[in-house]
Amino acid sequence: MRTYRAASLFVYEWGREEDPAVLYWDGLGGTGLHANEIGPLLVEQFGLRVMAPDAPGHGRSAARDPDAFRPSRLAAAAAELFTELGVERAAFVGFSWGGRVACWFAAQYRGRTSALALVEGGHHGSRAPTGLEAAIAEAQVEREEDTFNGWDAFFAFEAESLRRWTPALEEAHRAVMREEGGRVAPIATAEVVGAINQGNRLEPLADGYPAIGAAGLPVLLLVAEASETDAVERFRAALPDAQVEAVPDGIHDLVSFAPERVARTVGRFVAEQR
């Protein structure tokens, strides 16, 4: 694994520069290090180059102005990363909120997208805009709920939620938190998360689907079997040519819960588009 800064983002990378590129964008609050199990598998089994940035305001990447957290603006940030790294086209893999960014990237930069792989994301609806201040207040309440008395309490909660625990998972999940006032709290502040939620509401996913469909881009949606049925059906209706697969007994964080299944499904899908 290599790490570096490019286009004002902190980036984790696995694989060789000359191999077909994959950009992984993690979920809300997460970092590129969340790909530390699937990244090596995509390299070893499918010969891919995996780049996984910390989104602005996450991990080791600095926050930006509130308007910069709209998904279309974050897609532009990903395009800037491509340009700085000399990557012309890549498969965009988005987990959870990262799926929103992935969809907007594909809608705006069709010529730079070889495939779109969405993992438990890119298919959820959006609430009506509440205004930035209200969105930040909501995020502050959620952040307090996600704050723990210490690392042991945080790791125990994560291990129980994910139903598995490894040194790689501990490393990845530690990277999203920091010590704050004697407790362990998310690195992503309420201001960052509130701006993201407001941006998602101002730019609903449905607005990006027509451009993706018109471009004929190959699309994969991998969901937990218990994922919202209505959301999946709306996604199928909007993008009828998309490939949709479900993971039995899965949870929302499929990247942590079933890394081998995610890497195998995404890797095969990306390889088919070469």
Q: Predicted regions: what is each one?
A:
Residues M1-L23, E44-L48, V87-E88, P248, ...:
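Alpha/beta-hydrolase fold catalytic core
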Residues F10-A62:
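Conserved HGGG/HGGXW glycine-rich cap/lid loop of the alpha/beta-hydrolase fold
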Residues F46-V93, R264:
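Active-site loop/oxyanion-hole signature of alpha/beta-hydrolase fold enzymes
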Residues G94, G98, A102:
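Gly/Ala-rich beta-loop-alpha elbow adjacent to hydrolase catalytic centers
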Residues A107, S114-N149:
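Flexible "cap/lid" loop of the alpha/beta hydrolase fold
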Residues F148-E203:
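Conserved alpha/beta-hydrolase catalytic His-Asp/Glu region
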Residues G181-A238:
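Conserved serine/cysteine hydrolase catalytic core
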Residues G250-P259:
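Catalytic histidine-centered segment of alpha/beta-hydrolase-like enzymes
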